């Protein structure tokens, strides 16, 4: 049986710890529980998570707690980012007018063979090559 990989963007992981967004926190928890066997992340996602929760929260997470969270997330499949991925992201950012960082997420998801990208940073329902963009926080879905 093959796995349909689903790529999870940084914002989904951040909401797991965001006390100021309880509804999104619950949705993120439900998503990770439901999809736990087919989740793929990237090195970029792990790094962005660490920086966001330790520097950008109203009440920053301790460095130790953030490091433990990154360690826990590392148990999911983690897609490496290779020079080819970076070059593809540069090209995509120019051709689709996406930010480089969003393009790198897209390219990592495609490289991982993911069919779905869970994010709130791109347009819900959009298809990018073989990748379906899904905003898990969108109302009515």
Question: Where are the language model's segments positioned?
Answer:
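Active-site-proximal, substrate-binding regions of enzyme catalytic domains
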Residues: 50-76
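Acidic active-site catalytic centers that drive phospho-/nucleotidyl reactions
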Residues: 9-11, 48, 102, 121
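Active-site neighborhoods of divalent-metal-dependent phosphate/nucleic-acid chemistry enzymes
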Residues: 75-120
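Substrate-recognition element of Asp-dependent hydrolases with the DxDx(T/V) motif
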Residues: 40-44, 119
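Short, well-structured N-terminal submotif of metal-dependent ribonuclease cores
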Residues: 1-41, 56-64, 140
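Acidic, PIN/NYN-like endoribonuclease modules and their adjacent C-terminal/linker elements
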Residues: 1-5, 106-141
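Short acidic, glycine/proline-enriched helix-loop-strand junctions
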Residues: 66-70, 76-87, 95, 122-141
């Amino acid at each position: 049986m093959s796995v349909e990989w689903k790529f999870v963007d940084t914002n989904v992981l951040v909401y797991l710890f965001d006390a100021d967004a309880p509804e999104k926190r619950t949705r993120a928890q439900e998503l990770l529980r439901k999809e736990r066997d087919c989740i793929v992340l990237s090195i970029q996602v792990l790094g962005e998570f660490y920086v966001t929760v330790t520097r950008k929260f109203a009440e920053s997470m301790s460095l130790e707690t953030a490091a433990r969270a990154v360690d826990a997330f590392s148990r999911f499949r983690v897609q490496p980012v290779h020079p080819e991925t970076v070059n593809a992201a540069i090209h995509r950012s120019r051709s689709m007018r996406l930010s480089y960082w969003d393009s790198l997420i897209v390219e990592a998801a495609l490289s991982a063979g993911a069919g779905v990208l869970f994010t709130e940073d791109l347009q819900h329902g959009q298809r990018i090559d073989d990748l379906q963009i899904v905003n898990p926080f969108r109302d009515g879905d």
